[in-house]
Amino acid sequence: MSYFEGKTVLVTGAATGVGEGVAQRLYQAGATVFISGRQLEQVKKTAYTIDPTGEKVIALQADMTSPEQVKSMFETILAQTGALHGLVNNAGITGPHNTSIVDYNIDDWKAVMDTDINGVFYGLKYGIPALLRSGGGSIVNLSSTNGIVGIAGISAYTAAKHAVLGITRSAALEFAHQGIRVNAIGPGYVDTPRMQQLPNEVRQWMASTHPMKRMATRKEVANMVAFLLSDESSFSTGAFYAVDGGYTAQ
C-alpha cells in the first residue's frame, strides 16, 4: 500500500502549473488532496480534471497574502477530515523581469514579498499546528534556483526565494523534535502550460541554461515533492533539493 493512502495533503497555488502537477501526483499515489488558489472556479476546474468524483481532490479558495484566509483554510481542512499530514507551500508569483533594483516599483516589490514569503510564513504559522494535531508530518516549501543564486533584473523574486530557504531551515530546527520535517525544493525552468505558450526562442534559451539542455517536467518536480512528503525521506529536514538539471552546480 502506498504511503499516501489515508493521508491528507494541502497544496497551495495548485490551480495551474507546478502545483497542479504536484496535486495530480499525490492523488495518483492515494492521498486526499486539498488544493487552493485565489480563483475558486479555476481551482474547482482543476480539482475536477484530476478527480472527477470530487471525493479525493477538494478545491478551496484562499489568498495566501491574507492570514485570515489562510487560517480559515486550515480550519476547514481539519473540520472536513480531522487531520493534515502534509503541506506543500507552492503559491508564488515572479513579479517584473529585467528590472533594475533602482527602477523596481515599490508596490510590485511588496506584492512579490507578500505572496512568495509572507504566504509561506502564513502557511507555516497555521499549518504546523494542524500537522501537530495530526501527530506530525512533512512540509515542502517551493523555493527556486533563485533561492541559492542571484540573478540580475528579478531582485524581488530572488530575495523572496532566498527567504523561503531561510524560513525552511528555521522551521525545520524548531519542530524537528515534534515529528515535523520541513524541506525546500528549487526547480529550474519547468515546462508548464504557461511556459509552452512562450515563443520558441525563449523556450530554447530557458532550456539552454540547464546543463541537461532541457526544462524540467512537472512530473519530475512532483516526484521530488512526493519523496519529501513520504517516509522515504524520514531523516531529511532543513534541506534544499535542486530539481534544475545541474543549473546550480555550475
Label each residue range with its predicted role.
Residues 3, 124, 214-243, 247-248:
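C-terminal substrate-recognition "lid" of short-chain dehydrogenase/reductases
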Residues 8, 15-17, 39:
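Conserved glycine-rich cofactor-binding loop
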Residues 40, 61-73, 106, 219-220:
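The beta1-alpha1 cofactor-binding region of Rossmann-like NAD(H)/NADP(H)-dependent oxidoreductases
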Residues 98-101, 105-110, 195, 206:
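Substrate-binding pocket helix/loop in short-chain dehydrogenase/reductase
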Residues 102-121, 140, 164, 212:
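Catalytic Tyr-X3-Lys loop
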Residues 124, 160, 168:
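Active-site helix of classical SDR
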Residues 129, 173-177, 234:
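Alpha-helical segment proximal to the catalytic Tyr-Lys
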Residues 144:
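Residue(s) in the substrate-gating loop at a strand-loop-helix junction
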